[in-house]
């Protein structure tokens, strides 16, 4: 097949590698996916061709079949595309369609659905002036024509509402589809001014579909609801009301802030003015405006402020807090316990008496002797803790260890640590003693040491006071 001959719309006889012959109208050739699409396809079977699986012919006519190019054995052209009979350019013609008897002209293409990128074939759709699938204007709902992709102007019978420019646009679309291009036909149709005029002259029932062709329908300017206008104007109005507040109102608020009876009405009067939109859609803040930094009429009097504090009393309370009471119980002072008098820092008389009581106590910290104190030392005896006591403390602190009868023993090698071995409890070697001796009942002999039969882990032994480590 030479590239110059227009085969789109031709009747094609195709033989697959399975020796099955098909006849149909060549619809498109996809060079990217290496596929050939035929429309109105009929299968004639194997027709006595040598094959392992003979297939009889079928009478059904398939709407379309897409063939893989690598599985096509032979492809021949039976009939060239037939030219179409064009209508005269009559201004009175708005829409036209041919009868079903001339089914060989294959005039229209209605949708892009079945083939994905490729338009699906359909015959003589009698749709409205504006196509419902993608809003293109033409005879029926056609966008391209199977017939006569030749140099002559026999592509589509043009209607007077569209004019000769639509014929050129249709020929452009046919060329794009025959070359396998994926550009949308709407882009080229929207560039034609005659199509826009045809859309404008369409009938009223077709008005909903004209919005997708050419110029878009203008957006209706709906009146803005009054509630939205009020919402938009309310921040500006509130700002104006706040700026209209006179200075005497603020001064009156400052003068009456100590009077609860006068303060509440003023605040309640200011809050509705502030409303809920105090800070750009926020929930509002307190109704008083910020008038800048605070102004002082005179300098701060440090002497009068210091006169309110008794330094000696503060120092005495501070020293009383630092002192530690003696362990010996003492009699209550003035009917109060000494602990209460130490904690109570507001009673200066009680603190003074506490100072006298604690003065003769034991000194727990002397910086001249050592940096550390002797408060946290619970036992002054210098002794070494025994193994039994250490284990008892560990059990009281951390609880009993979990017993595990699995795996190898935790103590291997020479010495063995706590691995009580053999008859005499000698611990330690990798050659386990033949005996299953040890402390406690003989149970769970898991071979804790390699090669040993009586080995047990340390956690398997129950604690007994008479247990002693073998030397």
From Swiss-Prot:
Keywords, sorted A to Z: Cytoplasm, Developmental protein, Phosphoprotein, Repressor, Ribonucleoprotein, Translation regulation
InterPro entries: DFDF, FDF_dom, FFD_box, Lsm14-like_N, LSM_dom_sf, Sm, TFG_box
Basic and acidic residues bias: start-end ranges: 233-262, 323-341
Stretches with biased composition (Basic residues): 273-287
Entry's localization field: Cytoplasm; Cytoplasm, P-body; Cytoplasm, Stress granule
Motif (FFD box): 363-379
Cellular component aspect of the GO annotation: cytoplasm; cytoplasmic stress granule; P-body; protein-containing complex; ribonucleoprotein complex
Motif (TFG box): 382-402
Top-level taxon: Eukaryota
Sm domain residues: 1-81
UniProt-recorded Gene Ontology molecular function terms: DEAD/H-box RNA helicase binding; mRNA binding; RNA binding
Compositional bias segments (type: Low complexity): 150-160, 201-227
GO BP terms: negative regulation of translation; P-body assembly; stress granule assembly
Coarse class of the protein's main subcellular location: cytoplasm
Region span, Disordered: 146-165, 171-190, 197-292, 323-354, 404-456
Description of post-translational modifications: Phosphorylated.
Biased composition (Gly residues): 412-422, 433-452
Domain DFDF: 288-324
Function according to Swiss-Prot or TrEMBL: RNA-binding component of messenger ribonucleoprotein complexes (mRNPs), storage particles that mask maternal mRNAs from the translational apparatus during oocyte maturation. Acts as a repressor of mRNA translation. Probably involved in the storage of translationally inactive mRNAs in the cytoplasm in order to prevent their degradation.
Domain notes: The RGG repeats are required for interaction with ddx6/Xp54 and accumulation in ribonucleoprotein complexes.
UniProt similarity note: Belongs to the LSM14 family.
Subunit structure: Component of a ribonucleoprotein (RNP) complex, at least composed of lsm14a/rap55a, ybx2/frgy2, ddx6/Xp54 and eif4enif1/4E-T. Also forms a complex with prmt1 independently of ybx2/frgy2. Interacts with ddx6/Xp54 but does not appear to directly bind ybx2/frgy2. Different translationally-repressed mRNP complexes probably exist that contain either lsm14a/rap55a or lsm14b/rap55b depending on the developmental stage.
Name the record gives this protein: Protein LSM14 homolog A-A
Annotated organism of origin: Xenopus laevis (African clawed frog)
């Amino acid at each position: 097949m030479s590239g110059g001959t227009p085969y789109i719309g031709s009747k094609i006889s195709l033989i697959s590698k399975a020796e099955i012959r098909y006849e149909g109208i060549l619809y498109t050739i996809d060079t990217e996916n290496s596929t050939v699409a035929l429309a109105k396809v009929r299968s004639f079977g194997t027709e006595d061709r040598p094959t392992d699986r003979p297939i009889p012919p079928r009478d059904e006519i398939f709407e379309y079949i897409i063939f893989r190019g690598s599985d096509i054995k032979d492809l021949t052209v039976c009939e060239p595309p037939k030219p179409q009979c064009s209508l005269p350019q009559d201004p009175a013609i708005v829409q036209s369609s041919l009868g079903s008897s001339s089914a060989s002209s294959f005039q229209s293409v209605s949708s892009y659905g079945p083939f994905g990128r490729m338009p699906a074939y359909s015959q003589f759709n009698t749709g409205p002036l504006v196509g419902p699938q993608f809003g293109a204007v033409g005879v029926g709902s056609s966008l391209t024509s199977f017939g006569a992709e030749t140099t002559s102007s026999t592509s589509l019978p043009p209607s007077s509402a569209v004019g000769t420019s639509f014929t050129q646009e249709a020929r452009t679309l046919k060329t794009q589809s025959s070359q396998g291009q994926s550009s949308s036909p709407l882009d080229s149709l929207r560039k034609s001014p005659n199509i826009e005029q045809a859309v404008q002259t369409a009938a009223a029932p077709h008005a909903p579909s004209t919005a997708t062709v050419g110029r878009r329908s203008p957006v209706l300017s709906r009146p803005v609801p009054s509630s939205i206008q009020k919402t938009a104007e309310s921040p500006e109005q509130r700002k104006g009301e706040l700026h209209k507040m006179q200075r005497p109102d603020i001064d009156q608020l400052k003068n009456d802030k100590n009077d609860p009876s006068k303060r509440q009405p003023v605040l309640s009067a200011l809050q509705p003015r502030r409303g809920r939109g105090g800070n750009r859609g926020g929930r509002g803040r307190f109704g008083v405006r910020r008038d800048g930094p605070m102004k002082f009429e005179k300098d701060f009097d440090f002497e009068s402020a210091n006169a309110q504090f008794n330094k000696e009393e503060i120092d005495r309370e501070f020293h009383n807090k630092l002192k530690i009471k003696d362990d010996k119980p003492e009699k209550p002072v003035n009917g109060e316990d000494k602990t209460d008098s130490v904690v109570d820092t507001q009673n200066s008389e009680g603190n003074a008496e506490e100072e006298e009581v604690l003065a003769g106590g034991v000194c727990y910290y002397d910086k001249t002797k050592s940096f550390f104190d002797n408060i946290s030392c619970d036992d002054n005896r210098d002794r070494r803790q025994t193994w039994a006591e250490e284990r008892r403390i560990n059990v009281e602190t951390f609880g009993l260890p979990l017993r595990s009868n699995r795996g190898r023993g935790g103590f291997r090698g020479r010495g063995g640590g706590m691995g009580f071995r053999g008859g005499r409890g000698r611990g330690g070697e990798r050659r386990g003693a033949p005996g299953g001796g040890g402390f406690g009942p003989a149970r769970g002999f898991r071979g804790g040491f390699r090669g040993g039969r009586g080995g047990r882990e340390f956690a398997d032994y129950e604690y007994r006071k008479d247990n002693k480590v073998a030397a």
